[in-house]
Amino acid sequence: MKTGIIGAVAQEVELLFADLEASGTPVTKTTIGSLEFHEGILDGCPVVIVCGGVGKVNAALCTQILVSVFSVDAIVNSGSAGGLDPRLRVLDMVVSTDAVHHDMDATWFGYAPGQVPGTASPFFTADARLRNAAQASFERVAAGIRASLEGSDTVPAMIEGRIASGDLFVADAATRAR
């Protein structure tokens, strides 16, 4: 299975680029528009990694190129995000059960908040196979990460839940509650 990995900013993918280069396998770099896609083998798995820029439009552009040009089977978003769940801490991994647009509003046309016109629901259910793979991957590396952070207040955890995506930065209590 070939996996596409998207990071919005350089800090979210630079270690992945370095690991790919250090893997000892050939790395192909392909430029499409202003984007550079790095294709190779990471930990025995074929991957294509891209730093795509911030926002849903950039993520959609990268996703379409990864599917149409590189024929990836799955897409993973790597990087930081805001956290609406008070349990979340730095280094935690969030595995999506489903996703929703938090800034989509077609309610005037009779749709639910977050629902894209023409879809049956505002929620996009995550692929169970990919969720299971993410859980298994986390468990494989969690012990080593925890051991390296022994004595630290930051111990990574895996949390499953709904991911709300949008281009609106959530910085106030009213938006957060919505």
Regions from the PLM with identified roles:
Residues 1-64, 70:
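N-terminal short beta-loop-beta anion/metal-coordinating cradle
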Residues 13-14, 56-59, 83-87, 103-104:
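Short active-site-adjacent helix-start/loop capping segments
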Residues 19-26, 68, 89-100:
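A glycine- and small-aliphatic-rich helix-loop capping segment at beta-alpha/alpha-beta transitions
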Residues 40-43, 68-69, 86-87, 154-156:
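Solvent-exposed alpha-helices and their adjacent loops that cap or buttress functional pockets
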Residues 66-67, 141:
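Hydrophobic alpha-helical elements and their junctions with loops/disorder across both membrane
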Residues 73-74:
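Structural motif
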Residues 84-178:
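Mid-sequence, gly/pro-rich, charge-dense loop/helix-turn segments that line enzyme active sites
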